[in-house]
Amino acid sequence: MGKNTIRLTMAQALVKYLCNQYILINDKKEQLYAGVFGIFGHGNVTCLAEALEQVKDTLPTWRGQNEQSMALAGIAYSKSKLRQQIMVATSSIGPGATNMLTASALAHANRLPLLIISGDVFANRRPDPVLQQLEHFNNPTITANDAFKAV
């Protein structure tokens, strides 16, 4: 690798991308993504939470108590900012992800920007069974996150 190569995890690259998105609002350069609401667990704690911790001054993160309320708060923020700034909502895999479905549908129906980052299932079956990981037992490629395809 060359001297100018930057090595990042996928989560670090994603967070870096989010931190570098800007929009002009009234001739003032503002961050497009104002912050993150998150509940961290398996599927996002060891990657995304760690990456967000590194940029907490640039992209603040608030821990929510319920996934749906976090996503709805993100929608309210976008609406109050006239769709010019966006909040991010993240959760672990399973019921936490499905709790954000109603808010996702609401944002879609009202054309309000919201970025939802749902946790992912484990890449292998060694930790099986995982607490609250929803998946199809006959087809491990089908997960709770597939419910977001419609919205």
State what each model feature region is.
Residues 2-151:
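N-terminal alpha/beta PP-like core and its mobile active-site loop of ThDP/TPP-dependent enzymes
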